[in-house]
Structures are given as structure tokens and as C-alpha cells.
Amino acid sequence: MKKYNRIFTIVIDSLGIGGMPDSMEYGDKGVDTLGHIAESVEKFNIPNLEKLGISNLHPIKHVKAAEKPLAHYMKMKEASVGKDTMTGHWEMMGLHITKPFQTFTDTGFPQELLDELTKRTGHNIVGNKSASGTEILDELGEHQMKTGDMIVYTSADSVLQICGHEETFGLDELYRCCEIARELTLKDEWKVGRVIARPYLGSKKGEFKRTSNRHDYALKPYGSTALNTLKDNGFDVISVGKISDIFDGEGITESNKSKSSVHGMEQTLEIMDKDFKGLCFVNLVDFDALWGHRRNPVGYAEEIEKFDIKLGKVLEKLKEDDLLIITADHGNDPTYVGSDHTREFVPFIAYSPSMKENGLMDTVDSFATIGATIADNFELKMPENTIGKSVLEKLV
């Protein structure tokens, strides 16, 4: 018998809680996204995360351990190889990624790929290096507006990103070019996890801003996930933010794009008013995109505080047969060197108004605990060749 009719899983993108045992192998010595954020500010007001037990799970400055935490909580290790968005989310829903997605961080993309992209799109290409979005626009935004050239760049992730000015290049044209790039990068030697359309507005260097019309063209998951199992058995799988893009729409019954993390939480609150049975799967990307990669711990702290305010409203709306799970997909310590993700434990914080118990659970060896627990709740078997063990029976 189902314990919960609705499960809300919220991914605070990149909110790691300390380096994993193998983090040194990824160049991530001493990382701690949440801990170092708290140490970087004079005050850190997150009363709702506090009462759920965030500082009981991972003691941090300015935030007290709750005497009677409301939630069950534990740390999750990443079983897969990698520390990127797709690996983290795919593992949550049961996939074990044993071969990391290919990156072009140090080399840029092969000339043969760029030549083919130019031939197919009709646009010359500039950039072709690893850079932050703000840097590449400051450097090449004006040039692109004048010439119609495509800005192509990458990052520490397995991504090919294309920038286009919404007014001079055009959104439809940008999407067309990205679809061609996605087709080309399905070849093994050029394969990337995602092609990302990065539209922007503004008229000169220093004023360019990326817009919310971003679109991700992801690889399809390598196998069936918990999302497919839910959908195939008639349950709702409602996505918020970039979840649908990450899974290339696989297993999703309703997709809601977000303009910001605050907007994503507002969408979640609206979905809570709906009568559905199944999963609402939320990704809040601003933590990672605006603050983690840009190494801004103060901005990151403020974003968490904004989230906490909305979280309070979510807690008020939860029904007795609702379950809330708060987690993350990787770390991105904004005090660490470089601009890359960091290999960290992530939180598993589970709460329902019907829970009679609470407290610390043993660390688990995979993010896939989430997908397995969700499937178990709806009395479904996880697909073949997936990983993860349910902790549903402990959520009492």
C-alpha cells in the first residue's frame, strides 16, 4: 500500500555537503560547498532548513542543530564516475554511469566538427574555448551582433554551448543551430552530454545578460529510469526547471520551465494545489549557474536564504500523505579554485507531516536511493540494470 500519494523531490543544484573520500582524484581537496558558504557570511538565516535538521546532518556556522529535527536525513555518496549535472540526476533515478561524459575543456572542439557546424548552419564560429558565460559575452558579444558569427564555447562539463543575441541572431535561428549541433555531437568522437542554447540581450560589453530562454538538448538516458517506470504505470511525473531537458523528456508527463530558482519554487507551490498522484521533480539551477561557477559565496548564501523563505510555504502546504525530499546533484564550492563542480556528498532530507520519527540515517552509497525509494512507495519495481536501495521503510 502506498505511503505517500505525492512526492516532491527538490534538487538544490550544486549544494554539496563536504568532499567524498575520492574527491582528491577529481582535484577537489577540502571542498565543502554548504560549509564554506556559511563561513563566508556574517549571518546565515535559514530557519526552515534549520528545523528540518540541516545542521544536524552537516554542522555549519550560524545555523544551530535542531533539538527536535523534523526530518529524516543522511548523506549520499555518488556511485557514478563524474561530478556533473546529468550524471547526478541520472544516478538519482537509477542509472550507474561508469564512463565519464567527454569534455573539451582544455582543447576546445575539433576543427572538423566546427567546419561541419559552419557548413550546416551557414554561420562562422568564434570562441571555441572553455569560458564562463559572462566572460565570453564580454569578449565576443559585440562581434557576434555585428557579424552574425556563432559564439561556441564549453566548460568543465560535457557541453557545447552556443550564444545568440535574441534580437540580432534570433531565438529560432539559435535553436535551429543547436539542433544541428546536437545531431553532429551524437558521433562518438564528438559526443557531449548536452548542447545548450544560450540566448542573450544587451547592446554592448558589460551590459549583456543571458535570458531565461535557454534550452538544453541532452542525450537520452542510457536506459530506463524510475521516471519511465512511474509514467508507464500511469503516475504523474511533473518536472520543474531543467529536469525535462536533463532526461530529454524521457519519463516526463508534464514539463514546467523556470525563469529562476525563486520562480521554480513558486511553480512548485502552484503544483502543490493540484490533485495528482506521483512525482514532482524540481531542479533549481541558479545556485550552480549564478553563484557556484562564478565563485560567489555571498550570492550563493543569499540564494539559499531566498529558497528557505519559499521552503517555509512548501512545508505549510504539505499534506499528511505528501513526502518532501531535498537533495543536490553534485557540489560547486564557491570558495574553491577554478570554476568547476566539486565532488561531494549530497544531502537527503525527507519530511512528511505524517512522520512520527526523525533523525540521522546511515550514509548510502548511491544517489539512486531516491529513485528506488520513490518506486518502492508506488509499489513499483525499478527497471533492470539500475542501482539503488529504497529507504522507504525508515521514513516513518
Swiss-Prot record:
Q: Which organism is it from?
A: Clostridium botulinum (strain Eklund 17B / Type B)
Q: Which InterPro entries match?
A: Alkaline_phosphatase_core_sf (IPR017850), DeoB (IPR010045), Metalloenzyme (IPR006124), Phosphopentomutase_DeoB_cap_sf (IPR024052)
- Residues engaged in binding Mn(2+) 2: 288, 293, 341
The gene behind this protein is deoB
Disulfide-linked positions: none
Cofactor(s) for this protein? Answer: Mn(2+)
Q: What is this protein called?
A: Phosphopentomutase
Task: Report the GO terms under cellular component.
Answer: cytosol
Q: How is the cofactor bound?
A: Binds 2 manganese ions.
**Principal localization?**
cytoplasm
Q: Tell me, in a sentence or two, what this protein's role is.
A: Isomerase that catalyzes the conversion of deoxy-ribose 1-phosphate (dRib-1-P) and ribose 1-phosphate (Rib-1-P) to deoxy-ribose 5-phosphate (dRib-5-P) and ribose 5-phosphate (Rib-5-P), respectively.
Query: Please, which domain of life does this record's source organism belong to?
Result: Bacteria
Q: Per the record's keyword annotation, is Transmembrane helix included, yes or no? A: no
User: GO biological process: what's one of them?
Assistant: 2-deoxyribose 1-phosphate catabolic process
Q: Which UniProt keywords apply?
A: Cytoplasm, Isomerase, Manganese, Metal-binding
**Coiled coil stretches, renumbered:** none
One family name in Pfam for this protein: Metalloenzyme
